[in-house]
């Protein structure tokens, strides 16, 4: 029988800690996985103690997922190379702007049979334009990478409330392996082969959620927010089709949890919506609100809107994506929040 697969979780924020609860529990039950799960923790001090030591003694991430115990077989490791040493399965769940540096650091220390899955909701811009996070990991580390996206608010997953998720995998065998690692009776997973679209959904919906939050801050009501969701979905589909490498975008993928379901839950319950609402109401900067509302964690929606805007500008396509553009300009160019409504009124869908 093959040796059990060693698992490393790269990241330990709110979502990383929630997913560690599932992985730790499944690794204890399933013989194909090594019982000990290493979780890389970006070391910081919390109430005078190292976060990694708190996690390993109290079995709780008191900073990013307070109130939820982690299984005792999940071990916090502050040195990334130590955490990833000999790992067969890598679960990436860090803010997308750090992924290149982390991959560089892990080079040469993972197993020869290593495979990865990214839960990172973001994209990058390279010299040729759009760059998916999975592509960066694949190129830097030379491993196959699947993606998991879905309507998965971290605290609800941690509380074991029922939800669905989608794995996109170009190698079906690897997608099914990660399904075994991650699925529970309350976290149900579908595996599809349209991996790039699954990943794009996870990134682009955060831009739409910022727009939904602006509407909430302006007290526009549910009808307006429904329009933001619909027009945002149209722009997500158009963007995916525009940038697909091989015309492989399937409309059916947008009906999976990674698509319309994730879009709805994020526009009603996610942190991007919440911070955008506060931005509209208070006039404080995104950076100030991240510190106040997210313990300093980075908000992905505004960052992704900037990356998308630069890609669209490079391609001369800004005017075809007015909702994405409005979010970027409100966040970064001091345009008034009310421009969100103007963009809906004059959206090409209505002309």
Swiss-Prot record:
Reactions catalysed according to its record: sn-glycerol 3-phosphate + NAD(+) = dihydroxyacetone phosphate + NADH + H(+)
**EC number(s) for this protein?**
1.1.1.8
Localization recorded for this chain is: Cytoplasm
The EC class name is: oxidoreductase
The family database entries (Gene3D superfamilies) matched by this protein are listed as:
N-(1-d-carboxylethyl)-l-norvaline Dehydrogenase, domain 2 (1.10.1040.10), NAD(P)-binding Rossmann-like Domain (3.40.50.720)
Question: Which InterPro entries does this one have?
Answer: 6-PGluconate_DH-like_C_sf, 6PGD_dom2, G3P_DH_NAD-dep, G3P_DH_NAD-dep_C, G3P_DH_NAD-dep_euk, G3P_DH_NAD-dep_N, NAD(P)-bd_dom_sf
Q: Could you say which residues bind substrate here?
A: 121, 271-272
Q: Which residues are NAD(+)-binding?
A: 11-16, 154, 271, 298, 300
Residues of the active site? 205
Q: Which UniProt keywords apply?
A: Cytoplasm, NAD, Oxidoreductase
According to the UniProt record, one GO cellular component term is: cytosol
Q: Which GO terms describe its molecular function?
A: glycerol-3-phosphate dehydrogenase (NAD+) activity; NAD binding; protein homodimerization activity
> What biological processes does GO assign it?
carbohydrate metabolic process; glycerol-3-phosphate catabolic process
User: Where would you say this protein principally sits, based on its record?
Assistant: cytoplasm
**Entry-linked PANTHER family:** GLYCEROL-3-PHOSPHATE DEHYDROGENASE, GLYCEROL-3-PHOSPHATE DEHYDROGENASE 1-LIKE PROTEIN
Q: What does this protein do?
A: Plays a role in regulating cardiac sodium current.
Question: Which protein family is named in the record?
Answer: Belongs to the NAD-dependent glycerol-3-phosphate dehydrogenase family.
In Swiss-Prot or TrEMBL terms, this protein is called: Glycerol-3-phosphate dehydrogenase 1-like protein
